[in-house]
Amino acid sequence: MLTETELIVLGAVRYSDNASIVSTYSECFGALSFKCIRSASRRRGQANAFFVPLSILKVTLDYLPNRGIQLPKEQELLHRPIRPSIEPVANAVALFTVELLTRLLRSSGADRALYRYLREEIKGLEHLSDKGISSFHLRLMTGLLHHLGILPQSETYRPSSVLDFSEGTFRPSWSPEEQGKAYASSLLYQFISSPAPEELPLSGQERNLLLKLLLDFLGYHFPDLGNLKSPEILSQLF
């Protein structure tokens, strides 16, 4: 039976001279890969858009659960990100977003609420201020914590407390080493308790501190996340 679903493009690998395998996260099926054929009659710009990471497509396909690579009948471009192609900071946060989502969602099932959150965040990237763009990846990650069910309990925060990874709460530090992590925990508290966290006046060093804490926390709960390469690019920009 033919099914229509939206999806977010996460990457593409050339399969042949006129086809690529596109990796995505879809609204109806979760992680999904499909073969995209470059039609000779299709305008080159429109065809290339199907391979741009963070593009949003609508596809019609005869979905077969046991088929690793799906074969869509129709594809329609709904949204193509523009700022990452013309702004270095937007490009860096987009690269990070793609790498993070690819690692986190590569074997995930359908989660419509998560998909819709990601769709709106990606579309909203085009309208953020310069300050907001610089913190987009941090806002996205804190939102992911909520949708993945591991958002720390902000009501447990007290000044100089640290994030307890196993409990998902803030607690007093137990050692001098932990005291050094209290500042990053305070930044996380600000982010999860602010209505517009991307507009918080953070320095580059503060963004990198918070990014490391968020990655460590995600890695604790999702060990397959591994070490990402793109944070190094972000640290150089900030």
Which sequence ranges carry the predicted segments?
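Non-catalytic alpha-helical scaffolds and adjoining flexible linkers that form interface surfaces
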Residues: M1-I21, Y25-F238
